[in-house]
Curated annotation (Swiss-Prot):
Active site, renumbered: E47
PANTHER family (alphabetical): PHENAZINE BIOSYNTHESIS PROTEIN (PTHR13774), PHENAZINE BIOSYNTHESIS-LIKE DOMAIN-CONTAINING PROTEIN (PTHR13774:SF17)
UniProt GO cellular component terms: cytoplasm
Residue ranges that the Swiss-Prot or TrEMBL entry lists as coiled coil: none
Domain of life: Bacteria
UniProt GO BP: biosynthetic process
GO molecular function: isomerase activity
EC numbers, comma separated: 5.1.-.-
Source species of the chain: Halalkalibacterium halodurans (strain ATCC BAA-125 / DSM 18197 / FERM 7344 / JCM 9153 / C-125)
Record protein name field: Uncharacterized isomerase BH0283
Enzyme class: isomerase
Family according to the record: Belongs to the PhzF family.
Statement: the UniProt record of this protein carries the keyword DNA damage: no
Length: 265
């Protein structure tokens, strides 16, 4: 019987059952899209990462339970964590990932993993779907959009934490997801956020690395700084360090393996 190892990693946290869980499937060679989608649906996590050796690194693809996505931060962090944990790559060696969003790299920084991602600067939108505001039940300070998501700033951290979106309205919007953010009222964090992706089968993502490729540049202009400590205020919650340099966003997070298993196929 053919078996395939698969792991579940809690990303952007140093505690089990916090952060964002991702499944990581390490393959010897590529598998077909239908098989990968079936596995992702079976795992039923916000993302499942599939990787196999390619050139001087690894090919990496990400699937939600419903569809493939072009960029995913927490599953990339989880993939790097597993490759180092299993000694596929020495801890001193950066990992190169070949993805649909180009070449991404991961490096160890002590107990943290640093991801080198492209900046996804939002552009302000003056016209936007009614479902966006009705679905969130808020009055925005700002509405913008990049190639993936809408970005909305609101004026209250408490209001952000209390949001109870109407997902049947939000999933009608032609976008991957909706990022809602506010300046943090604490001295610990610069800003907080929540991220909703009903269109791809994930109502609320616990911690979204790729969203911070948009949040980082946005708050860089607002706060006139290049380094941030951010918190995603989902039920599980998660923390990220962010550094901006030119058109790159460096995301730093931690990860914990919580499950090792085998697919019997």
């Amino acid at each position: 019987m053919m078996t395939t190892p698969i792991y579940v990693v809690d990303a952007f946290t140093n505690q089990a059952f916090k952060g964002n869980p991702a499944a990581v499937c390490v393959l010897p060679t590529s598998r077909d899209d239908i098989w990968m989608q079936h596995v992702a649906s079976e795992m039923n996590l916000s993302e499942t990462a599939f990787l196999h050796p390619y050139q001087d690194g690894y090919s990496l693809r990400w699937f939600t339970p419903n569809t493939e996505v072009d960029l995913c931060g927490h599953a990339t962090l989880a993939s790097a964590h597993i490759l180092w944990e299993l000694d596929h790559i020495s801890a001193e060696q950066p990992i190169t990932f070949y993805t649909k969003s180009g070449i991404l790299t991961a490096s160890k920084r002590g107990e943290w993993i640093e991801l080198d991602f492209p900046s996804e600067q939002p552009k302000q939108e003056n016209v936007y779907p009614n479902e966006l505001i009705d679905g969130l039940g808020i009055q925005p300070l700002y509405v913008g959009r990049n190639r993936f998501d809408y970005l909305i700033e609101i004026d209250s951290e408490q209001r952000l934490k209390e949001l109870n979106p109407n997902f049947s309205l939000l999933e009608q919007i032609d976008t991957r997801g909706i990022i809602v953010t506010s300046k943090s009222t604490s001295t610990e964090y610069d800003f907080i956020s929540r991220c909703f992706f009903p269109a791809v089968g994930v109502n609320e993502d616990p911690v979204t690395g790729s969203a911070h490729c948009c949040l980082g540049p946005y708050w860089q202009e607002k706060l006139n700084k290049n380094e941030f400590l951010a918190y995603q205020a989902s039920k599980r919650g998660g923390m990220l360090k962010i550094k901006l340099q030119h058109d790159r966003v460096f995301l730093l997070g931690q990860a914990v393996t919580v499950l090792r298993s085998e697919l019997l196929l």
